[in-house]
Amino acid sequence: LKYPIEHGIVTNWDDMEKIWHHTFYNELRVAPEEHPVLLTEAPLNPKANREKMTQIMFETFNCPAMYVAIQAVLSLYASGRTTGIVLDSGDGVTHTVPIYEGYALPHAILRLDLAGRDLTDYLMKILTERGYSFTTTVEREIVRDIKEKLCYVALDFEQEMATAASSSSLEKSYELPDGQVITIGNERFRCPEALYQPSFLGMEAVGIHETTFNSIMKCDVDIRKDLYANTVLSGGSTMYPGIADRMQKEITALAPSTMKIKIVAPPDGKYSVWIGGSILASLSTFHEMWISKQEYDESGPSIVHRKCF
């Protein structure tokens, strides 16, 4: 099993091209040469990568027009906002992206290389301590499913650990494909706790709450209150029950005492980038933002930096 995207950045273009081909022809069943294509990218995506994406869309797939948008900005649009800070955590990478009037502020974007795949690996490790063995890529998919179905974020980690130790109220059972039933207790909240305490994974980094706070502090003092009041969670690794309440508690502890803090956790958080893309593409003003095949032929791949920002 290979992953052409590492930490949110495409690293294997041949495989990525195969995935796009499969998406167009097998999943969407559309001819790419007949439709404009909106692609999304990670924050701080290298310039060469944006150019490569653009080149593949026009030269391999013959798209009539295309546009590249930053994922976090689309998530913010999906929440009905144009100003706010997005904590976007997917499978390979987590970013905090402050956005003002629709534009990401690159100097204040922070990246944390801790996301869904790391949490799945960690859950595999702590389930092994319980005597269950998960090692193969197939078994990793099972553990990912356990994670998505049973894990949650504790409001108070120490207190939750005490509860788990003194009673079986937090235990849940899960049936494996072979019919074996396993029981999982404090692992349910120990796994996503690593988002707040990366030291659990042996990482030096600060947690997602501090990363969000640090990102806000890199912004102009005049816009900070708009960011605190519009903190939007997005991506599959923000889908844990309890994550918004915990975030509210942690940011409140870090922020000035009078600050109004609002954490927005959309129920469809794992699709909010896609939803934001459909909003952007349906705006009446958007048609003049596309890069056309003609513009590409005249200017080459670097056109993407002039038209998509």
From Swiss-Prot:
<dbReference type="Pfam" id="PF00022">
    <property type="entry name" value="Actin"/>
</dbReference>
<keyword id="KW-0206">Cytoskeleton</keyword>
<dbReference type="InterPro" id="IPR043129">
    <property type="entry name" value="ATPase_NBD"/>
</dbReference>
<protein>
    <recommendedName>
        <fullName>Actin-3</fullName>
        <ecNumber>3.6.4.-</ecNumber>
    </recommendedName>
</protein>
<keyword id="KW-0378">Hydrolase</keyword>
<keyword id="KW-0067">ATP-binding</keyword>
<keyword id="KW-0963">Cytoplasm</keyword>
<dbReference type="GO" id="GO:0016787">
    <property type="term" value="F:hydrolase activity"/>
</dbReference>
<comment type="similarity">
    <text>Belongs to the actin family.</text>
</comment>
<dbReference type="GO" id="GO:0005524">
    <property type="term" value="F:ATP binding"/>
</dbReference>
<dbReference type="InterPro" id="IPR004000">
    <property type="entry name" value="Actin"/>
</dbReference>
<dbReference type="InterPro" id="IPR020902">
    <property type="entry name" value="Actin/actin-like_CS"/>
</dbReference>
<dbReference type="GO" id="GO:0005737">
    <property type="term" value="C:cytoplasm"/>
</dbReference>
<dbReference type="InterPro" id="IPR004001">
    <property type="entry name" value="Actin_CS"/>
</dbReference>
<dbReference type="GO" id="GO:0005856">
    <property type="term" value="C:cytoskeleton"/>
</dbReference>
<comment type="function">
    <text>Actins are highly conserved proteins that are involved in various types of cell motility and are ubiquitously expressed in all eukaryotic cells.</text>
</comment>
<keyword id="KW-0547">Nucleotide-binding</keyword>
